Amino acid sequence: MASDEQWYVLVEASYGFTDTQWKLEEKCHVVGGRSAALSRAEEICRTWCPFGWKPEECGRTVFEVSETSWLVELIEERWPESDDHAYTRGEHFRVTVARVVHPKEAPPAHPPEKKAGAIRRAFGGGR
């Protein structure tokens, strides 16, 4: 194992009602190599919740898809005062351990060059 390897735990959550899509919600850098990343991923599977969910108010089933990937299903039951019955909502997210294989940062943005147009010249700008 190279000492400069970078390990991450990635959390992808589904969103949308009709055409569900996946979005990268968390990108957690882990120091300590692959085994530390696996431990952190298992912790995230047991504790992480999407926005609007409370861990203490939902059921959770963790599925190990592979040695480095999990699918977590959350289920919550509520009984609003205005209804005569309870309802159930569900959500799921993926947790994956990943090693960075090609890091390339985006180049920094620069302000656009000011252009001397006809109006700018009329007011003395762009000389």
Where are these regions (language model features)?
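Generic hydrophobic secondary-structure signal
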Residues: 9-11, 30, 106
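A short, exposed loop/beta-hairpin motif centered on an aromatic-Gly-Thr core
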Residues: 22-36
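Generic structural motif
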Residues: 14-16, 33-34, 77-79, 100
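Short, mixed-charge low-complexity intrinsically disordered segments
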Residues: 47-127
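Short aromatic-glycine-(Arg/Gly/Cys) micro-motifs in beta-strand/loop hairpins
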Residues: 1-26
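Short, well-structured hydrophobic secondary-structure segments
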Residues: 32-39, 46-50
